[in-house]
């Protein structure tokens, strides 16, 4: 990345024990990326990522899908039950620990090394053994990489009081999905805005009128300076799916058998 033009220290992109860009990039809902763009928990995401929430709040009297929605003050921001925003606090290399557990535990089918249910149990053990604080808002996710040759545990914090702040009408925000995606060049206002709320101590909490906007560790600043040809760019986020960590045998299987 240095050769391509990265100028900031790599620790400002990701730091396991410090504040970095990763603290401003969130997992929005069940499968989208969001970006924290204010010190008080304002989150920018796609219109199609917020679509379910916009639909949830829409009615005959308030057709936000058609007309759009903008909260003019904090009191007008709409609580959205069921919607969550998740931060990654730490990513830990737990390969040695998992390898030891695999040797100790029974595995009659030989599938433990990739089993989500088994790895979830191992994650709980690791957190207990390493005295990692686990609260009701903590989510532990242990993932196998490179066909089970490496294991990483993601320690996450989940916020559940998320309120809708703004969204353009669908005529502006809807990006067309696969119907339009490969058909013609187009520009759409594919965005929506939400805010993370927490209790007065900044901890995740269920919706309450007493909750306050989250004072975040890090937020992104939107530049209006524009871009120049050759500027360094990179993307951080949560893709719906990818296969970048496939081993060669998996690539061969997809090419010759699955055809994906």
Place the predicted regions along the sequence by residue.
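Short, basic/aromatic beta-hairpin or loop at an interaction surface
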Residues: 17-20, 198-213
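A conserved glycine-rich beta-strand in the N-terminal activation segment of trypsin-fold
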Residues: 23-40, 219
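Short, well-ordered loop/turn sites that connect or cap secondary structure elements
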Residues: 37-38, 226-230
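Catalytic-histidine neighborhood of serine endopeptidases
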Residues: 44-88
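Short, surface-exposed secondary-structure boundary micro-motifs
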Residues: 48-49, 237-239
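Short, Lys/Arg- and Gly-enriched loop/turn segments at beta-strand edges
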Residues: 53-56, 240-250
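Long, charge-dense accessory insertions within large macromolecular proteins
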Residues: 90, 110-196
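Conserved small/polar residues in nucleotide/adenosyl-binding loops
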Residues: 258-260
């Amino acid at each position: 990345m240095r050769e391509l033009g990265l100028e900031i220290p790599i620790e400002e992109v990701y730091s396991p024990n410090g504040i970095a860009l990763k603290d401003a990039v969130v997992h929005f809902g069940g499968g989208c990326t969001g970006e924290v763009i204010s010190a008080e928990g304002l989150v920018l995401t796609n219109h199609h990522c917020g679509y379910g929430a916009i639909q949830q709040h829409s009615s005959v009297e308030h057709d936000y899908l058609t007309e759009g929605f903008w909260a003019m003050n904090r009191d007008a921001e709409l609580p959205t039950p069921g919607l969550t925003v998740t931060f990654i606090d730490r990513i830990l290399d737990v390969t040695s620990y998992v390898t030891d557990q695999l040797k100790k535990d029974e595995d009659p089918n030989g599938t433990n090394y990739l089993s989500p249910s088994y790895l979830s149990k191992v994650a709980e053990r690791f957190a207990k053994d390493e005295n990692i604080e686990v609260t009701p808002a903590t989510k532990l996710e242990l993932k196998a990489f490179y066909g089970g040759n490496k294991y990483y545990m993601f320690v996450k914090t989940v916020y559940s009081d998320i309120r809708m702040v703004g969204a353009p009408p669908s005529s502006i925000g809807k990006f067309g999905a696969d119907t339009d995606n490969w058909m013609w060049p187009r520009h759409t206002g594919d965005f929506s805005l939400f805010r993370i709320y927490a209790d007065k101590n900044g901890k995740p909490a269920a919706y309450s009128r007493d909750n306050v906007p989250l004072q975040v560790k890090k937020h992104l600043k939107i530049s209006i300076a524009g871009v120049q040809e050759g500027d360094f760019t990179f993307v951080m986020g949560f893709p719906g799916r990818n296969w970048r960590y496939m081993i060669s045998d998996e690539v061969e299987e997809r090419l010759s058998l699955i055809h994906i």
